[in-house]
Amino acid sequence: IIYTIASNQVNAIRFMTATRTLILGTAGGEFTVSGGGTDSAVTPTNILIKKQSNHGAANVDAIAVGNATLFLQRAKRKVRELAYNFDVDGYIAPDMTILAEHITESGLTQMTYQQEPNQIIWGVRDDGELIGLTYQREQQVTAWHRHIFGGRFGNATITVTDYANIVNGTRIVLTKADGTTTTFTSATS
């Protein structure tokens, strides 16, 4: 399906995620895409696209957690949580970094999600430091933290290995731009 979004700007699509509806993040705003009704399929003749916010997204994959989508804003310094709000009967995207703006000040290059044993959104900053956001929306828990492992990782690729059946550990693998990898295992008790 090729469809032109009625908008006053032409922007590249940065991410697509599925929560309550299909969410499109562009460089200029965030949109919901549906089939026009509850549980209706999107077809060439049955499509409804609504703009939800004007923040704009960076070219970093968004993360769907439950009914929310966490995405990096265009300047790569703010993590936003796009979620449906019954009070406004639409989606809102509050700034998740508002109480810890210093932690993402240098910008983020990527994000990934760890579901077990704790729900954490991991990110690599532009200066190479590893940061995390402990995130449990249903409990209203958001806590930022930095992790310094005795070095900086620059343009690292971060992979969080999810051990759903092993409650006592999480392994983080960082792959540097030159291809070398460093593995960290964190045991929880």
Give each language-model segment a name:
Residues 1-118, 133-152:
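Beta-propeller and closely related beta-pinwheel folds
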Residues 26, 125, 176:
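Acidic surface patches and DE-rich sequence motifs
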Residues 120-123:
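Conserved, well-structured core segments that form or line functional sites
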Residues 153-189:
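Polar low-complexity, Ser/Thr/Gly/Ala/Asp/Asn-rich disordered segments used for subunit assembly
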